[in-house]
Amino acid sequence: NLYQFGNMIQCANHGRRPTRHYMDYGCYCGKGGSGTPVDELDRCCQTHDDCYGEAEKLPACNYMMSGPYYNTYSYECNEGELTCKDNNDECKAFICNCDRTAAICFARAPYNDANWNIDTKTRCQ
């Protein structure tokens, strides 16, 4: 779920950047997404959005409150290393891996302050 995703981001980047800095970045980090990603970090968000889209198509994720935004999965954070636990069902495992992959991607990608809170109407066509 989104709360766990935020915690994964903090784990992967060792708390160096607040999660809220990723909520309104580029064309894809935050609610919605369109156009061409502005940089590597924005591509991480586009990939994460696409992964959630795939999760929503899974039969195992096709029931009320089972989607990627609400479903609670089991994972572990150990000194920046993220592990999705084996006790997750198919849907939870898929969502956990979407979030894990994105959190690692965020931690590796450079953050450009100029791409925070951009005018998406003009920059994300």
Swiss-Prot record:
Alphabetized Pfam families for the sequence: Phospholip_A2_1
Disulfide bonds: 11-77, 27-124, 29-45, 44-105, 51-98, 61-91, 84-96
Cofactor dependency: Ca(2+)
Protein residues bound to Ca(2+): 28, 30, 32, 49
GO molecular function annotation: calcium ion binding; calcium-dependent phospholipase A2 activity; phospholipid binding; signaling receptor binding; toxin activity
Family: Belongs to the phospholipase A2 family. Group I subfamily. D49 sub-subfamily.
Name by which UniProt lists this protein: Acidic phospholipase A2 HTe
